[in-house]
């Protein structure tokens, strides 16, 4: 029987998370969550269990900023990079979860890289 979309998503998420844990070496994690309408990103210190910076399209000024949600995702990427710099964070690793690196996720990652985050 074929796998459902949800099963494939969960498999991808586990595969990505395990690869990231193996190569983490104490670095911070830029975790991304996408829904059909919004996207959010958090810089998480897994060693201490603390979120150091966060940005979301639910915030005032970061929502629907252009013709589509890809532009809003890029705005969230720029915001998280700016907040990371303010907190003194330059390097992290990108945790896309089970989401494909395409569209909104790619736009957020590219904008965060342009903003100065290295991953």
Curated annotation (Swiss-Prot):
**Gene Ontology molecular functions:** 5S rRNA binding; structural constituent of ribosome
Mind telling me which GO cellular component terms the entry cites? cytosolic large ribosomal subunit
What's the superkingdom here?
Bacteria
Statement: the UniProt record of this protein carries the keyword Magnesium: no
Which InterPro entries does UniProt cross-reference here?
Ribosomal_uL18_bac-type (IPR004389), Ribosomal_uL18_bac/euk (IPR005484)
Cite the Pfam families for this sequence: Ribosomal_L18p
Q: Provide this UniProt record's keywords sorted from A to Z.
A: Ribonucleoprotein, Ribosomal protein, RNA-binding, rRNA-binding
Keyword 4Fe-4S in the entry? The reply is no
Which CDD domains does this one have?
Ribosomal_L18_L5e (cd00432)
GO terms, biological process: translation
Q: What is the similarity comment for this entry?
A: Belongs to the universal ribosomal protein uL18 family.
Complex and partners: Part of the 50S ribosomal subunit; part of the 5S rRNA/L5/L18/L25 subcomplex. Contacts the 5S and 23S rRNAs.
What is this protein's function per UniProt? This is one of the proteins that bind and probably mediate the attachment of the 5S RNA into the large ribosomal subunit, where it forms part of the central protuberance.
Protein name according to UniProt: Large ribosomal subunit protein uL18
Which species? Cereibacter sphaeroides (strain ATCC 17023 / DSM 158 / JCM 6121 / CCUG 31486 / LMG 2827 / NBRC 12203 / NCIMB 8253 / ATH 2.4.1.) (Rhodobacter sphaeroides)
Gene name tied to this protein:
rplR
């Amino acid at each position: 029987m074929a796998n459902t979309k949800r099963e494939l998503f969960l498999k991808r998420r586990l595969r990505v998370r395990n690869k990231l844990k193996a190569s983490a070496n104490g670095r911070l994690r830029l975790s991304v969550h996408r829904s059909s309408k919004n996207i959010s990103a958090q810089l998480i210190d897994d060693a201490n269990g603390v979120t150091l910076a966060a940005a979301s399209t639910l915030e005032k000024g970061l929502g629907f900023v252009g013709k589509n949600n890809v532009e809003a995702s890029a705005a969230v990427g720029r915001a998280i990079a700016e907040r990371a710099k303010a907190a003194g964070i330059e390097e992290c690793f990108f945790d896309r979860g089970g989401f494909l690196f395409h569209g909104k996720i790619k736009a957020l990652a590219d904008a965060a890289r342009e903003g100065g985050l290295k991953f």
